[in-house]
């Protein structure tokens, strides 16, 4: 069966003929609506149901005035016909009736059936009633019922008794807005059944016999209405004239009212430290070193509580220790020194994230709750404040201008109207005022206004020709009639404008109309595209004709074929417009359409020069907003952009805030449809027990994690066995995402599965908030699951939830409500959500959507928090201005410009006193450390800004402000790394990850946290000379120089061991590229971390077609050299591989979470994350389909591949050479690279240095004892020449300072010179360490005294054990043997202590033989590892078709080429399966 698109068969026929009898012929036999299956990837080619016939009949209560023939008119537009005086009617109007075909559909969209009205002849209104809405829990929505406002009741009591039939124009400020008087969807209010058929009359063609009396309106409302004349009245609606916006305002107000200012649980005004579930495996035996500061006490108290200690118990112990037993712990709280962050009393210490990361001494401050500042709390007077969205949105000033202009123009129009009625002269003044009114209303000129203006001009022209002297009709009477029609047309245009766009006014009395529809009518989607208004004059000259296309989409997929419509040239009336007036008939039953269907219309111009069709603008709209279809005429802003985002066509793109330069008018039918939920099919009693193979196949398919990675065939298989899927073998997003379409039956089954599903964890529901699931019921269930997360847990996923708002059907959705609720409960959530929304405002298509949500957030936050938001925003604005001025300055002037502009920040803090840091709301700043601010010489010229901490117990805070770089991608990568680190911590694995904060504060700008005591690997390489990147010992030597004590060195080695493994795993999974020594950082405590994530997901830079990043991740031989302590502890490399593989396998178990987080960001506009191929890249790196053994083998190969990748070293060498040539000696070190300014730490200071003795060798070494600031001591040896070299360096670096005199050799007598130098050098060191803080803490002084320690040096210290200890030196091999079905798998992991007969290291490989089978048939072999006594393999050996283990022996032989090294025979029947085990090797020479 094929669909037939029916339009006017002859558009050139006269206008009168288009109202004659029309017939739609059936293409084929009727088809049951229940058989309609609506898919996504096929063109609709079948029709369902019958298309009825039109018949004509006369209705005495309606009127038509036929208009002149029009060549391009094929349908009805807004108020198509003239409307005559309100008390004059004609009997020539036509009535359209439908033959009843079938009963009302029980599913989908039902026709709006209205009760019979009373006194329907008293008024006719365009308003829409608001029926009773029972919410999402009802089985269906109720039938729309008429609703009368106070204005309606007055209208019904009035009769026209005055001869003046003009409307009254006024502005009402005190009448509360009522939804029924400004509905945006024009729902019909009344019905009238007559003799077996139903009347259907276009609202633009019908007025009833009643209306209001202007005089009585004035007498009734004269106290509340600003009277302007005798025409029209406007009422103020602060919540907007649009019902959707007004409803959203009411919803936000109700949410806010649930959280009273007096509720200290949710309105403490404090920033609580974030917590997680207590990591038992990590902190089972951990104790924290805590210093407690108490008011009126100079010395802190020292406690060492266990990690599982409750905060309130610690407070009780502190109070008991202070002999204040009368004080209650509940009245006290602990704050973190240096910040405004407070611990949560009901949580364990170890649950707080700050304790999980900070392993040093933690300083806390005990405060009384009532004395702790709650400055961010909401005040009592805010509980009853009203939410008017237009008071917070940017375009509020546009509304005011529009309203004020409209009122002014109406006054002028009224003045000229009175003058015209009195004198019948100066009609052109009237026409000019009408043009101005249309201009204010988006430059929209309706047909009714055009016809009235033309007729008015014609009357006065004929009057001048004495045309009416012989006529019974007076010119004055005709003028009154036409001006009434003109006023009515203006009135209706104002009403349509107010319902189409956001406005804070609307007409007081909207004329109502009635429409009728047989509920059994199988109606198809149909509407009229009338015109595109206000065509730019440049288009008029460039294009000879204009056309449009339209289509329907659902979930980013087209539901039907795109149709092109006829080309029409523009015309000039008041403004340029293109008038198609073309009726569009979709061959789709409305009830078969998905509820979340979107209509998209494109405007094309036919170029005069090339005759090509160029896309000029587009718009989109939901077909069924608020569960009901759109009724009547609507205006739509057209977006002047290249292409609509097909995948993101959602209501969020539909911007109704204000008219755009080009406005599209669409006339929808007067009859509406209302959505009814499908009945769920609960019967599953006939299901058979699934086959075992079927369940296994479902589990294999579930490894795809997201429907986007499933092929159509696999989707069909999964959907076929959908009722066998559960949370043990599959995920709900995969099952629902495999549905073949969104027809009524499929939706019913999806909802059935949805209700029956048991979620394994709340985060599984994240996959239901992607763009693949627009269904509101599915998204509602997803939010219900996420509501089980705590505020601190939800905080981690806010970026994805903000993106998910794009695909919500309206701003009253459960997801938006969840975000607002949590922002009221947590300042942390509110603060992060604020900056995410501020950043999202820069997204082109969803700016208005996010603006409204941001306004709602600010209303909920309260005045105090909003004041902080304003200060933070102002701070960012000043930083942006400073950055721009520094960039625009020349190289030699930049430092001067920066110093001058920093003064603006000082003025800022003089005005605001304090301000919270956007990066971290718990940090409050009060000023600028002027001398510590600088800029960096990288391409973006970022600023280093050091703020003064407002907390007297805190240190200064340094941040980097970047302008010119898009930091959103950095935010995403760091968020995903934080998620992985949290997973590791919960599994008991602390990878010592440093994850710095990063915040995008606007388009291509943002803040980056500076990590103290960190330096780039490139700088370490530069200190090692020209070929530093090629040396093996560079990193080891650097750590040795900065960790002289054995304990410090071991700690640094352990930190590097774990952090290097962690960053290897995360950078591999995320495919982080552009890795070189300039974006790898090291701290002196051993932590390694990466920065700058502009390239990820494998999008490597290329040079000459060759990728610059050719290693899976950065793990170089110099890193291995440090881990193995120069090769002395080769088993450390095995431990490193084990750690990496363990961390990798832990993350693989959470593949679904990572892929869901990435999928939810697909449409965030990130350059590196834009398609399914990017998700597939991460999927391929995670390998969720692999076993742990397979994944271990895979990642080990990647480690070896990275270790052997020489281009990495070459790339580091190139960057080092480039940096050495770029850095000018005149520039300070802190300006060469952002992180290098953190090289010096105030904690690395020296108290004193004393020479203990000297040795009379050729070099005359002096033994020096160095006392550190923490009272620790170390020893170092220096020669007299080294002292002299130090003095020369200080003279060059501090030429402006007066340095102590150095005891040169010529100052000393020839006798007893050694003892004299002993004394003089001690005196010299004492002076140097006291000359100034700048000299004492300089690089050269610190490196002189803290390098080359002789006590417990790294070379002399005992080995550091990082993994499993092996006291013996016997050779052994580690295996993991598994057996499933008939498959035997052996993972060869490591070997230890293997040697050749001469004692040298072998290049060993392993051979396997499965006995008693012939050796050649069952022989397997691994690759060889060259020259290693402790080799690592992690290779898998597989034997298939092993029916049983009993009677089989595995022979393992280790060889170095052909030389025998060792062997063992393993009886498989006694082997512990799936466990790691070390097996001894026999016959090897030790």
UniProtKB/Swiss-Prot annotation:
Q: Where does the PI3K-RBD domain lie?
A: 285-371
Spell out the subcellular localization from the entry: Membrane
Q: Which parts of the sequence are annotated with region: G-loop? A: 935-941
User: How does the entry describe its membrane topology?
Assistant: Peripheral membrane protein
Quick one: where's region Catalytic loop? 1071-1079
The record, for SMART domains, names: C2, PI3K_C2, PI3Ka, PI3Kc, PX
Q: Which GO terms describe its molecular function?
A: 1-phosphatidylinositol-3-kinase activity; 1-phosphatidylinositol-4-phosphate 3-kinase activity; ATP binding; phosphatidylinositol binding; phosphatidylinositol kinase activity
| The enzyme's E.C. designation | 2.7.1.137, 2.7.1.154
PX domain location: 1240-1352
- Could you tell me what this protein is called? Phosphatidylinositol 3-kinase C2 domain-containing subunit gamma
Q: Which organism is it from?
A: Homo sapiens
């Amino acid at each position: 069966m094929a669909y037939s698109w029916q339009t006017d068969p002859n558009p050139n026929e006269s206008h009168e003929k288009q109202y004659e009898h029309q017939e739609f012929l059936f293409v084929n036999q009727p088809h049951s609506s229940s058989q309609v299956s609506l898919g996504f990837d096929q063109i609709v080619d079948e029709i369902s149901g019958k298309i009825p016939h039109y018949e004509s009949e006369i209705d005495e209560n309606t009127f038509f005035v036929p208009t002149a023939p029009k060549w391009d008119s094929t349908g009805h537009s807004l108020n198509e016909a003239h409307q005559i005086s309100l008390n004059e009617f004609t009997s020539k109007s036509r009535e359209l009736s439908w033959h009843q075909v079938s009963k009302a559909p029980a599913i989908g969209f039902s026709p709006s059936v209205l009760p019979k009205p009373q006194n329907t002849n008293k008024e006719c209104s365009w308003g829409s009633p608001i029926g009773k809405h029972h919410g999402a829990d009802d089985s269906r929505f109720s039938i729309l019922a008429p609703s009368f406002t106070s204005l309606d009741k007055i209208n019904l009591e009035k009769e026209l008794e005055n001869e003046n039939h003009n409307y009254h124009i006024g502005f009402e400020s005190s009448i509360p807005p009522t939804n029924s008087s400004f509905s945006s969807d024009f729902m019909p209010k009344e019905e009238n059944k007559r003799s077996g058929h139903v009347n259907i009359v276009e609202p633009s063609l019908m007025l009833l016999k009643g209306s209001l009396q202007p005089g009585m309106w004035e007498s009734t409302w004269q106290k509340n209405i600003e009277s302007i004349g005798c025409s029209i009245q406007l009422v103020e609606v602060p919540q907007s004239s649009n019902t959707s916006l007004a409803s959203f305002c009411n919803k936000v107000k109700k949410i806010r009212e649930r959280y009273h200012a007096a509720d200290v649980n949710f309105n403490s005004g404090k920033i609580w430290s974030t917590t997680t579930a207590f990591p038992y495996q990590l902190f089972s035996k951990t104790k924290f070193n805590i210093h407690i500061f108490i008011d009126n006490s100079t010395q802190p108290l020292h406690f060492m509580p266990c990690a599982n200690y409750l905060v309130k118990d610690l407070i009780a112990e502190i109070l008991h220790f202070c002999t204040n037993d009368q004080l209650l712990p509940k009245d006290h709280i602990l704050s973190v020194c240096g910040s405004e962050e407070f611990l949560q009393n009901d949580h364990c210490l170890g649950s707080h994230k700050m304790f999980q990361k900070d392993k040093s001494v933690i300083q806390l401050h005990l405060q009384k709750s009532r004395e702790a500042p709650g400055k961010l709390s909401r005040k009592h007077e805010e509980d009853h404040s009203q939410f008017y969205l237009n008071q917070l949105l940017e375009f509020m000033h546009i509304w005011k201008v529009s309203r004020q202009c409209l009122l002014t123009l109406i006054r002028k129009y009224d003045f000229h109207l009175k003058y015209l009625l009195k004198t019948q002269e100066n009609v052109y003044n009237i026409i000019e005022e009408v043009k101005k009114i249309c201009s204010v209303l988006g430059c929209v000129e309706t047909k009714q206004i055009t016809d009235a203006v033309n007729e008015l001009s014609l009357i006065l022209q004929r009057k001048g020709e004495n045309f009416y002297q012989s006529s019974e009709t007076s010119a004055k009477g005709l003028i009154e009639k036409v001006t009434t029609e003109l006023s009515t047309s203006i009135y209706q245009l104002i009403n349509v404008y107010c319902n189409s766009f956001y406005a804070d006014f609307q007409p007081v009395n909207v004329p109502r109309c009635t429409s009728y529809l047989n509920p059994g009518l199988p109606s198809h989607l149909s509407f009229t595209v009338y015109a595109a208004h206000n065509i730019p004059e440049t288009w008029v000259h460039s294009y000879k004709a204009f056309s449009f296309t339209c289509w329907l989409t659902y979930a980013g997929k087209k539901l039907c074929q795109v149709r092109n419509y006829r080309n029409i040239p523009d015309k000039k009336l008041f403004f340029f417009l293109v008038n198609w007036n073309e009726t569009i008939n979709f061959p789709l039953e409305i009830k078969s359409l998905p509820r979340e269907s979107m209509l998209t219309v494109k405007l094309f111009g036919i170029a005069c020069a090339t005759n090509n069709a160029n896309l000029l603008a587009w718009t989109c709209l939901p077909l069924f907003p608020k569960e009901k279809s759109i009724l009547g005429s609507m205006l739509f802003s057209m977006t002047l952009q290249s292409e609509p985002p097909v995948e993101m066509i959602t209501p969020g793109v539909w911007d109704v805030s204000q008219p755009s330069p080009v406005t599209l008018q669409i006339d929808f039918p007067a009859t509406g449809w209302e959505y009814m939920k499908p009945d769920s099919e609960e019967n599953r009693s006939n299901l058979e027990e699934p086959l075992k193979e079927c369940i296994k196949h479902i589990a294999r398919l579930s490894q795809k994690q997201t429907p986007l990675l499933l092929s159509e065939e696999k989707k069909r298989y999964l959907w076929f066995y959908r009722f066998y899927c559960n949370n043990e073998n599959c995920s709900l997003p995969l099952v629902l995402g495999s549905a073949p379409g969104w027809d009524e039956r499929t939706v019913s089954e999806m909802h059935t599965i949805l209700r029956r599903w048991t979620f394994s964890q709340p985060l599984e529901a994240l996959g239901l908030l992607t763009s693949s699931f627009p269904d509101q019921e599915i998204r509602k269930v997803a939010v219900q699951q996420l509501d089980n997360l705590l505020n601190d847990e939800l905080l981690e996923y806010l970026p994805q939830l903000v993106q998910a708002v794009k695909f919500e059907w309206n701003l009253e959705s459960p997801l938006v409500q969840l975000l607002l609720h949590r922002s009221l409960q947590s300042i942390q959530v509110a603060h992060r959500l604020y900056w995410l929304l501020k950043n999202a405002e820069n997204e082109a298509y969803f700016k208005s959507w996010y603006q409204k949500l941001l306004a709602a957030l600010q209303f909920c936050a309260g005045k105090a928090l909003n004041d902080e938001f304003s200060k933070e925003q102002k701070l960012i604005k000043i930083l942006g201005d400073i950055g721009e001025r520094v960039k625009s300055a020349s190289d030699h002037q930049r430092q001067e410009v920066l110093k001058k502009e920093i003064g603006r920040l000082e003025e800022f803090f003089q005005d605001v006193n304090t301000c919270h840091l956007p990066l971290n709301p718990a940090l409050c700043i009060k000023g600028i450390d002027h001398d510590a601010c600088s800029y960096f010489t990288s391409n973006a010229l970022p600023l280093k800004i050091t703020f003064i901490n407002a907390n007297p117990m805190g240190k200064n805070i340094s941040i980097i402000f970047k302008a010119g770089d898009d930091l959103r991608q950095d935010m995403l990568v760091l968020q995903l790394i934080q998620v992985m680190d949290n997973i590791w911590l919960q599994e008991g694995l602390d990878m010592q990850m440093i994850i710095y904060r990063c915040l995008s504060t606007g388009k291509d700008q943002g803040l980056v946290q500076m990590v103290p005591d960190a330096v780039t690997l490139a700088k370490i390489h530069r200190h090692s000379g020209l070929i530093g990147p090629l040396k093996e010992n560079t990193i080891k030597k650097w750590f040795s120089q900065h960790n002289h004590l054995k304990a410090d060195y071991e700690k640094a080695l352990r930190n590097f061991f774990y952090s290097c493994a962690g960053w290897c795993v995360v950078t591999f999974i995320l495919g982080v590229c552009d890795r070189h020594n300039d974006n790898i950082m090291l701290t002196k405590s051993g932590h390694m971390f990466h920065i700058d994530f502009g390239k990820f997901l494998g999008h490597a830079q290329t040079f000459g077609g060759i990728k610059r990043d050719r290693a899976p991740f950065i793990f170089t031989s110099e890193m291995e050299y440090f881990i193995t302590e120069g090769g002395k502890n080769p088993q450390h490399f095995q431990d490193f591989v084990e750690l990496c593989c363990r961390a990798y396998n832990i993350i693989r178990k959470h593949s679904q979470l990572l892929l869901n987080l990435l999928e939810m960001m697909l449409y965030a506009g990130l350059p590196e994350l834009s398609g399914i191929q990017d998700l597939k890249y991460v999927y391929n790196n995670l390998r969720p389909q692999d076993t742990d053994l397979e994944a271990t083998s895979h990642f080990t190969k990647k480690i070896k591949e990275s270790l052997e990748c020489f281009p990495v070293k070459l790339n580091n060498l190139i960057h080092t050479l480039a940096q050495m040539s770029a850095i000018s000696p005149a520039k300070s070190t802190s300006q060469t690279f952002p992180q290098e300014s953190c090289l010096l730490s105030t904690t690395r200071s020296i108290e004193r240095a004393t020479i203990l003795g000297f040795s009379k060798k050729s070099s005359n070494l002096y033994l020096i004892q160095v006392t550190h600031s923490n009272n620790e001591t170390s020893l170092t040896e220096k020669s007299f020449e080294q002292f002299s070299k130090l003095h020369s360096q200080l003279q060059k670096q501090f030429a402006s300072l007066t340095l102590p005199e150095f005891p040169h050799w010529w100052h000393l007598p020839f006798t007893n010179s050694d003892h004299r130098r002993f004394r003089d050098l001690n005196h010299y060191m004492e002076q140097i360490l006291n000359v100034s803080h700048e000299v004492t803490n300089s690089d050269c002084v610190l490196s002189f005294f803290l390098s080359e320690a002789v006590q417990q040096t790294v070379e002399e210290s005992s080995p550091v054990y990082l993994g499993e200890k092996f006291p013996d030196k016997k050779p052994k091999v580690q295996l993991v043997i598994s057996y499933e079905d008939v498959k035997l798998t052996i993972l060869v992991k490591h070997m230890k202590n293997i040697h050749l007969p001469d004692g040298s290291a072998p290049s060993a490989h392993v051979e396997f033989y499965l006995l008693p089978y012939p050796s050649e048939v069952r022989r397997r072999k691994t690759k060889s590892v060259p020259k290693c006594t402790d080799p690592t393999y992690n290779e898998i050996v597989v034997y298939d078709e092993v029916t049983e283990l009993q009677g089989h022996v595995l022979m393992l032989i280790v060889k170095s080429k052909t030389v025998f090294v060792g062997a063992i025979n393993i009886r498989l029947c006694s082997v512990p399966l799936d466990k790691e085990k070390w097996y001894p090797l026999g016959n090897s020479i030790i």
